[in-house]
């Protein structure tokens, strides 16, 4: 089956932002104007097309990255609407991994918020080109240029307005396109009657002149040939054409040198068609982004170009239980994925058969025969393929770069309300953990309780809610527990020697390691410096495995050991008695012996907390954060709205129930956001209490 839309006319984009910036409403309007839906859905009414989980419709927040296909100006646009709540960071992370461009939505009143910064960092990590859409221009306090300044200063982006709004706040009724130098005025509520003219309204003429000049400067700086022409224009030479500006702006955006900034009000149906034009004009096709990299079977780096005739390579970026069956969402990078075909999962070294392929219009599933290079869709029939796995041709195997998956920071014990539900609970937990890699399930070895871990209170709340709704399991939930960790502060040399003689064949394994503190965030790092065969090659891996397993339980309070580096420097073996198991045990002993002498300390997760409150309450809030062992890092006041903002680093252990506390301390007018920052040493007095508790004292 031939390709119906050329690859150059495909756009894979995400819509990402802070919670309440208006992402889902923006997606709804895009679907309305591009003809996918014929009636607008509203988030606050619970009718949005992309919010199709029951909890999303109730809470008015988008939890899972819904993938939808639409068309505009003969281009196919595949859209992923991502959640703005920090507890669902993995959804943003996995969508960034498979996108070619992003619309970053900002509220024209709230501006750059903490989650805007998180999303921006994720887009930076994957080098995804961006357009900034400053939304809610009709709101009281809306300020396009203030938010544009925040994008430049706080996100350090080379943001360049390519539009200027016409009218302020409730009078916002149009915009001037600085590339085409045309005015667009909206004359009806649906935003479908638009007056287009070459005349610039008098009240914005000075602003238009100022920002048109900034736009020309910015595009000229990304293109030497254009810079010459621009300098000649300043001296009375030929002016830059609209095509030249558009072309350079496109190239600058794709290379990440420029972020075009546009404005609108999705709720009031203003500016959405121009946003779609900008997606087509400035965001890249799959052929315009760097080829995807991966590892070939021989360990060398390989690349796959976006081409239907190249060998198949695709990444599974999400797994979801669905009434249809188990959906595995994939992004095809090269080649063609066909319904009914056998695929090779290079990550798992397994073959599987795809029974059906579908593309989504949110609730609606449309069956297709194939997915081609650059396509996003979902496969049914894959039982072993999980998030981050590579699907490819067995004859042309490659393992693509996977996703960055953050560690969970909070855990709770969970048990079914009735014994009969035990089996249903374990099925539910398995299904949910397959869908969400930041959701972990384990069994506490001492209490034998089932423990679930995630990214925050809301994350776990929603997962427990889903257990009840989708799997009909009622569960009792314990109090939240903090994911403490242990590490070392001193470098030492230590050894592990395992010898067992009990008649017949004995056991012998001996390793000498240098144990030292690792880089923050490095986890466990192993290096072998064995020369001369004091430890045979076949025993090095088992020794490393033993060390890794020993790190799963530290010596102070049994929490996992992180940020340590172990270098294998020496050892000895026995021709007959040595075995892989003996060296695995010796490796484990070396870590346990060494850690006790290497000044072990307890670490706790620190959260970046941002609180916004009316000025009158700021003293109370700062005092409260200090009492929670918080470190205040910054404070600013928006005089125009009498709102104060505080940024602090606070231990997660002291933040449980903060949502209720902040409401009572600010008469319900305070809002806050919280995300994981880093691990930090627990003060000794606090550590003693935690250690005593872990030992049951």
UniProtKB/Swiss-Prot annotation:
Its taxonomic path starts at: Bacteria, Bacillati, Cyanobacteriota, Cyanophyceae, Oscillatoriophycideae
**Which compartments is it annotated to reside in?**
Cytoplasm
Output the HAMAP family linked to this UniProt entry: EF_G_EF_2_B
Biological function: Catalyzes the GTP-dependent ribosomal translocation step during translation elongation. During this step, the ribosome changes from the pre-translocational (PRE) to the post-translocational (POST) state as the newly formed A-site-bound peptidyl-tRNA and P-site-bound deacylated tRNA move to the P and E sites, respectively. Catalyzes the coordinated movement of the two tRNA molecules, the mRNA and conformational changes in the ribosome.
Keyword Nucleotide-binding present in the record's keywords: the answer is yes
Q: For this entry, list what GO says about its biological process.
A: ribosome disassembly
What is the protein name for this chain? Elongation factor G
> GO terms for CC?
cytoplasm
Organism of origin: Arthrospira platensis (Spirulina platensis)
